């Protein structure tokens, strides 16, 4: 599928940044309009991240127009906002394949394009990487410029300020563009402020500024007075004091949808020395009314027809595991005001919207700050509350030290509701929940549960809520649950005990999590026993011992990395019990899992019923 590029006559002339830089500046507003129109049609046909990219169209055009990319380094933080960048860097004709198996990567990816100078997916990494590239450019006297673009949401992460503090100390030449899209463009982002930004980034002003520093170096009292005067002038119209204190020269805020103002300001800033920050104000969903009104709802979209101004209605389906979790939260909070729920900026994705509305005093959004979210839970536990930290598997990686040092070490009863465990699909290797069982299993005092369906998920969450001897984790996948009938009555499960779901002979399949249905189907071909292990830690020692003594071969199945996962725990236990037994471990291989539809990936990894059956047959051959 491709579009008739003649509908976009200026964009047709700018398939690469080199071609873009050949265009007269006068046509850039039209290019931005066409780029936005192409993005609308492209994502409408393919699905993908949507609102953020609509907000960065003018910025993307201006950066590639002013800077000599890829020689000059451009780093996008996270990458949701980088679709226009992909369109302008030679990937326009393949944009309809984005997030699909074998298609364009959902985020900037070094292996995909020389214009993607740093692979991203998690937030807050761009400034650190940009600083390193700026230092390298100075060491090599390469003359290249370095630019990072970071959204205001990512600025809540401590890593960003660690990097900015270091950059202010090293004082290398670099530009950080703060894309502030949390509010509509305010009154001070107009002609006066754009003019001031261009003035303060211009050569005349900056030359006087730097020369004055040298002259006043020996006169500290007068130098301090001059500094305060400058800050007062800038402070009348700009909120940049914090960045100035970190050692950055702050310019802005300016209208991020005025491509001419962006070009002029970037031209002025391109040759400034030291760390610079340009604050621009944009609107998520710019140019598409439904996305402007509801940028969260239009953050990522399925295939849709832009002309209808609405997303297609969702097909009726079983509730998602996230919704099951959200309902459980509300059910418990109705009876216990000491239940507190914490999320690192994933309210919608984690199923917590209703809870946040009904129990606002028990709800805490820690923003994109996973380390803080985990330790916040630890602090609440110290004061007698029952904190539930709802977090995606991939983002728990960022709070691992806090999990160990602040929670498990102190045996604090924090419940971790770990969403997106296993394959998540289209967001690719930065977001697959491949490692949580492995890295949690090594932590003392942890109880780790893996439900096979939504009812077990509900009961396990309640088990964690009731358990006061230390931290617990309930790990469940993305997407629709299995359709199991939910039991409203909540009962705490016996810790470390599994269940036999099918009695067979010779082969025993020890299943961990929602692969149970596939394991049961595969078992039919071998008349195998199937156990729903439920607990990854502690393991059911008695059950594993019994299965090892009464079967010839054990098979472990999990949607987690094989290395260090639940199957590894079974092998370790068998060695401890001095029970040598052939064990086939089925799970995720020792590689980063690429993007694609979840069903496609599961099939390719042979974790569906047919794949599990084939792996067992191959092992027995």
UniProtKB/Swiss-Prot annotation:
Its EC number is 2.2.1.7. GO terms for cellular component: cytosol. Keywords: Isoprene biosynthesis, Magnesium, Metal-binding, Thiamine biosynthesis, Thiamine pyrophosphate, Transferase. It holds the Pfam family Transketolase_C. Pathway: Metabolic intermediate biosynthesis; 1-deoxy-D-xylulose 5-phosphate biosynthesis; 1-deoxy-D-xylulose 5-phosphate from D-glyceraldehyde 3-phosphate and pyruvate: step 1/1. Its cofactor is Mg(2+); thiamine diphosphate. One of its GO terms (molecular function) is magnesium ion binding. Belongs to the transketolase family. DXPS subfamily. Catalyzes the acyloin condensation reaction between C atoms 2 and 3 of pyruvate and glyceraldehyde 3-phosphate to yield 1-deoxy-D-xylulose-5-phosphate (DXP). This is 1-deoxy-D-xylulose-5-phosphate synthase. It comes from Shewanella piezotolerans (strain WP3 / JCM 13877).
């Amino acid at each position: 599928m491709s579009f008739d590029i003649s509908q976009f006559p200026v964009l047709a002339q700018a398939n690469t940044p080199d071609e873009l830089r050949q265009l007269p500046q006068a046509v850039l507003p039209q290019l931005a309009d066409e780029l936005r129109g192409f993005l609308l049609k492209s994502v409408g046909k393919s699905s993908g991240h949507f609102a953020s990219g609509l907000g960065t169209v003018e910025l993307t055009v201006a950066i590639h127009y002013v800077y000599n990319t890829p020689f000059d380094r451009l780093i996008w933080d996270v990458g949701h906002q980088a679709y226009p960048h992909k369109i302008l860097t030679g990937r326009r004709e393949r944009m309809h394949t984005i997030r699909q198996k074998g298609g364009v990567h959902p985020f900037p990816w070094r292996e995909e394009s020389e214009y993607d100078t740093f692979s991203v997916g998690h937030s807050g990494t761009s400034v650190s990487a940009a600083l390193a590239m700026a230092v390298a450019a100075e060491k090599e006297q390469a003359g290249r410029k370095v630019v990072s673009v970071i959204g205001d949401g990512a600025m809540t992460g401590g890593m960003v300020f660690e990097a900015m503090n270091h950059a202010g100390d090293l004082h290398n030449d670099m530009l950080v563009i703060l894309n502030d899209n949390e509010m509509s463009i305010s009154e001070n982002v107009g002609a006066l402020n754009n003019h001031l930004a261009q003035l303060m980034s211009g050569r005349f002003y900056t030359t006087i500024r730097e020369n004055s520093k040298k002259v006043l170096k020996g006169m500290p009292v007068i130098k301090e007075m001059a500094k305060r005067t400058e800050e007062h002038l800038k402070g009348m119209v700009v909120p940049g004091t914090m960045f100035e204190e970190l050692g950055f020269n702050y310019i802005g805020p300016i209208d991020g949808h005025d491509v001419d103002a962006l070009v002029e300001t970037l031209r002025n800033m391109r040759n400034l020395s030291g760390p610079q920050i340009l604050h621009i104000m944009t609107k998520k969903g710019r140019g598409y009314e439904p996305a402007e009104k509801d940028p969260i709802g239009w953050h990522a979209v399925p295939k849709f027809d832009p002309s209808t101004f609405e997303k297609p209605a969702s097909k009726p389906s079983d509730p998602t595991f996230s919704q099951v979790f959200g309902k459980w939260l509300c059910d418990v909070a109705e009876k216990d005001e000491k239940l507190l729920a914490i999320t690192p900026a994933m309210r919608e994705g984690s199923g917590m919207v209703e809870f946040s509305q009904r129990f606002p005093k028990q709800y805490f959004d820690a923003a994109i700050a996973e380390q803080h979210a985990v330790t916040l839970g630890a602090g609440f536990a110290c004061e007698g509350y029952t904190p539930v930290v709802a977090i995606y598997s991939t983002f728990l990686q960022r709070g691992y030290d806090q999990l160990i040092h602040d929670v498990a070490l102190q045996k604090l009863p924090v419940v971790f509701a770990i969403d997106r465990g296993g394959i998540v699909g289209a967001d690719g290797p930065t977001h697959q929940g491949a490692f949580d069982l492995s890295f949690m299993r090594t932590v003392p005092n942890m109880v780790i549960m893996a439900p096979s369906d939504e009812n077990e998920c509900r009961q396990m969450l309640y088990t964690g809520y009731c358990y006061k001897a230390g931290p617990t984790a309930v790990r469940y996948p993305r997407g629709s649950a299995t359709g199991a009938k939910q039991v409203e009555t909540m009962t705490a499960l016996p810790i470390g005990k599994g269940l036999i779901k099918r009695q067979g002979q010779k082969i025993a399949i020890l299943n961990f999590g929602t692969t149970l249905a596939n394991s049961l189907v595969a078992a039919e071909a071998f008349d195998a026993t199937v156990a729903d292990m439920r607990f990854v830690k502690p393991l059911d020692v008695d059950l594993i011992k019994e299965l090892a003594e009464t079967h010839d071969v054990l098979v472990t199945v999990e949607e987690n990395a094989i290395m260090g996962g639940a199957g590894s725990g079974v092998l370790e236990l068998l060695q401890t019990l001095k029970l040598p037994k052939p064990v086939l471990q089925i799970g995720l291989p020792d590689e980063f899992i690429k993007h694609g539809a979840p069903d496609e990936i599961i099939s390719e990894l042979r974790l569906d019923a047919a794949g599990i059956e084939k792996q067992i047959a191959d092992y027995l051959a």
